[in-house]
Amino acid sequence: MELKWPKFISVVVDDMEKQRRFYRDILGFREAESSEQWVDFRLPGGYLELLKRDASPQRSSKRFQVGFTVDDIHAAREELMRRGVESISEIEGDEPGSKNLWCHFRDAEGNVFEITQWLKNPEG
């Protein structure tokens, strides 16, 4: 298993529209995709993702998370769990049209990180 350079950083926000305006209008980031729960801004080599705070274990108490790209998410998840890394979600994103699969873990101090396997080119 090889964890590759972070492809994204997620920032958990309480006021999505306020943060969206800040990153888009003040910092000049280009908005790529969005929903009511998240906004992606494309950056060279990756993206910044704003996530609306909710009751999920991944977002309830932390303000950010890092996502690492892997080639085979099933093998990577199995290996991380074998190494004693705490898994806090099953593999998600396995729906028709999905661009990626992902799952979440906690590091030694409880910080959340994600591993992602891209099914389609994340740039387009």
Predicted regions and their residues:
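Residue-level detector of conserved, well-ordered beta-strand and adjacent loop positions
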Residues: R42-P44, L51, R106, T116
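Vicinal oxygen chelate
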Residues: E2, P6-D14, V39-R42, P57-G124, ...
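Short, surface-exposed beta-strand-loop junctions and turns on beta-sheet-rich folds
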Residues: Y47, S56-P57
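Short, positively charged
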Residues: Q19-R21, E79-S87
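Residue-level structural signal for beta-strand termini and adjacent loop
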Residues: Q37, R53-D54, W118
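Core segments of cupin and vicinal oxygen chelate
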Residues: S10-L48
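N-terminal beta-strand motif that seeds the catalytic metal site of vicinal oxygen chelate
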Residues: M1-K18, Y47, F64-V66, L119-G124
